[in-house]
Amino acid sequence: LHKGHISLVKNCQKTCDKTLVSIFINPSQFNRKTDYKNYPRTLDKDIKILKKLKVDYVLVPNIKEIYSRNTPRKISINKKYKVLCGKYRPGHFEGVLAVINKFLKSLKVKKIFLGEKDFQQYFLIKNFVKKRFKTKVVLCKTIRMGSSLPYSSRNKLVDNKSVRIAQKFT
């Protein structure tokens, strides 16, 4: 978990009676198996952070629990979403929606909190949820690092030269 995730938790705690955080690294969101294998995993540390934040529930499902026989690994998306990130990460949004669908069918939560950093993903999820669930999708402000980059689990994979280039656009 990073400060962006912590901000989402705190936003939830401000407006909800109970807070549930799910931690699931979704293999269907990754185009390359090496990206999935190299994705940062810090479960023990993350749970300690969530305990400190006094989160009510932490859900850490395994792949079999998410992808049971009746759960699709991907949910088709309209081609209008296959631009920007959707163009360069084929299958990513379809995998995201499959897990969102599973969670919301199972958990029946009133709200989910997403960061504006992933605006295209937020927009897609918001429209998907609006058509199928009574859950409100809450958009939360992007939290930035000292380098002005938004916090992201993938930032560990970015070299200094790339950070300097990215700073010109933030």
Question: What positions do the PLM features span?
Answer:
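Nucleotidyltransferase catalytic core that binds NTPs
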Residues: 1-170
